Amino acid sequence: MKMKILLIGGGGREHAIAEGIKESKHNPILYALMAKKNPGIAALCEDFLLEKETEVEKIVEYAKARNIEMAFVGPEAPLAAGVADALWEAGIPVVGPKKACAVIEFDKAWARNFMKKYGIEGCPAYEVFTEEAPAHAFIEKLGDVAVKPSGLTGGKGVKVMGDQLPDLKAAKDYTSELLEKGPVVIEERFIGEEFTLQAFVDGKNLAFFPAVQDHKRAYEGDLGPNTGGMGSYTDAGEILPFMLAGDIEQAKKIMQHTVTALHEETGTGYQGVLYGQFILTASGPKVVEFNARFGDPEAMNVIPLIETDFTEIMSAVVKSTLDSLPVKFSRKATVCKYAVPAGYPDNPEKDSEVLVGDVGEASVYYASVYEKEGKIYTTGSRAVAVVGRAETIDAAEKIAQNALENIQGKLFFRKDIGTASLIQKRIDHMKELRGGLSQKQ
C-alpha cells in the first residue's frame, strides 16, 4: 500500500517539500492543504483543499476523509495554531512540533527566557518589556541594540542599531510603536555574519543539514528594507566559505542542548524541523532566533541535496528512530534566488502575470503566486524561486541567474546573491572580526 501524506502550506518551501516527498522510491500519494492554489504543489498532488492553513478542525476533517497516514506542516502559523497537536490526537503522526515546542518560534520573549533558564549557549544580554520607560532606559544602558516584537512577524519585525535604526532615538521610537501591540524583546546587537543551521529532529536525535546563508535585505549590496529572504546559498560541504569547522560544531551543540531542554521544559519531544538562525561573531556563533520549521528560502537549498529517501526520514522523525537512519547529502553547492513583485516588500504589485520561460538546469519553486485559468499571478509577496546546483557556488550562481533572466513579469531580484564578490566580502568581514585567522581551517 502506498502511504498517503498530507502537506500543509502553499509557499516555495512547501513546493520543495512536496518535491522531496514525491521523489521517494515508495511512491507516496500526496495531498495538500493551502490557502491559494500553488501551481507547483498542485501538479504533484493527487488532491488538494484550498483552505486557511490555521483552520485546525477543517484540516483534521480533510485528513480523516482522505485517510492520511502522515502529515508535514510547512509554515509557522499552523504550528502556532496547534495543527500538529490536533492531527496527533486524531491518530495522524506529524513532522512539525506540537504547540508546546513551537512556542520557541512564535514567542521571542519565551524563547530568550527559556535559553537563559537552561544555560543555552549563545544567548545575548536581553530584557523583555511591556512598558515604555524601563524599555527606553535599557536601550540607553546597552547602547547597541536589536529590537524585536515578541510574536510572529514573517521575518520582518526585527530592527537593529546602525542598520534600520540610525540612533538611540530611532530605537526608542520603534520600541514605543511595538509596545502598542504587545511585549518587546530588547537585546544586545551582535556583530558578525549570519548563517542558518537546520536539522530534522525526532524528539532527541538531530540530523543536520549543511549551513546556509540567507539575504534578508531587499536590494543589492544588502540595502533596503527587511524581507522574508531574497535568496540563499550553500557550499559543497557542511560549512560556508567564511566559517571554520569548529563554528558549525558549536552551533550543533547549541541546537542539541535546545532540543534536550525543550523536552525537559515541556514534557513533549520536539518532532519536526528545527531552524537555528546564528550570527558568527569573533567569539563564535550566537543565537539570533530559533524557528520551528524549514527556512524559506533555505529549504530550497537543502532539500534537493538529500540523498536519503525523504519519506523514510519523515517516518524516522515521527517514530523517534533518526539515530538508526543515516541522512546523507550530495556534496554540491546551491544558490537560490527569488523573483519578487515590483515594489516589494512595502508597495508590491499584485495580481500581475508571471511567465516562466526556459530555466535550463535550474529548479523552479512557486511561492506566493496563484493559478487562474492556466495563468500564474503574483499575490504581493515573493513570487518564484530558482535554484542552481553545481560543484561550486560560482557555477550554481550562474545557473540560477540564467534562469531568472527567463522569468518575465513586473518582478525584480538580487543579482549579487552567490556571486564571488559578495562572498569575498563575507570572508573579509569574518577575517577582520577574528583578527586575520584564515578561513575553512
UniProtKB/Swiss-Prot annotation:
Pathway per the UniProt entry: Purine metabolism; IMP biosynthesis via de novo pathway; N(1)-(5-phospho-D-ribosyl)glycinamide from 5-phospho-alpha-D-ribose 1-diphosphate: step 2/2
Cofactor remark: Binds 2 magnesium or manganese ions per subunit.
Residues that coordinate or bind Mn(2+) 2: 289, 291
Gene3D superfamilies per UniProt: 3.40.50.20, ATP-grasp fold, A domain (3.30.1490.20), ATP-grasp fold, B domain (3.30.470.20), Phosphoribosylglycinamide synthetase, C-terminal domain (3.90.600.10)
Catalysed reactions, semicolon-separated: 5-phospho-beta-D-ribosylamine + glycine + ATP = N(1)-(5-phospho-beta-D-ribosyl)glycinamide + ADP + phosphate + H(+)
MF terms (GO), sorted A to Z: ATP binding; metal ion binding; phosphoribosylamine-glycine ligase activity
EC number assigned by the record: 6.3.4.13
UniProt: ATP binding residues: 139-196
List of residues binding Mn(2+) 1: 277, 289
Record-listed Mg(2+) 1 binding positions: 277, 289
Cofactors demanded by this protein: Mg(2+); Mn(2+)
Recorded superkingdom: Archaea
Keywords per UniProt: ATP-binding, Ligase, Magnesium, Manganese, Metal-binding, Nucleotide-binding, Purine biosynthesis
Any one of the GO BP annotations: 'de novo' IMP biosynthetic process
Top-level enzyme category: ligase
InterPro entries from the UniProt entry: ATP-grasp, ATP_grasp_subdomain_1, PreATP-grasp_dom_sf, PRibGlycinamid_synth_ATP-grasp, PRibGlycinamide_synth, PRibGlycinamide_synth_C-dom, PRibGlycinamide_synth_C_sf, PRibGlycinamide_synth_CS
Ranges where the ATP-grasp domain occurs: 112-319
Residues that bind Mg(2+) 2: 289, 291
NCBIfam families: purD (TIGR00877)
Family, per entry: Belongs to the GARS family.
Protein known as: Phosphoribosylamine--glycine ligase
Species, as recorded: Methanosarcina acetivorans (strain ATCC 35395 / DSM 2834 / JCM 12185 / C2A)
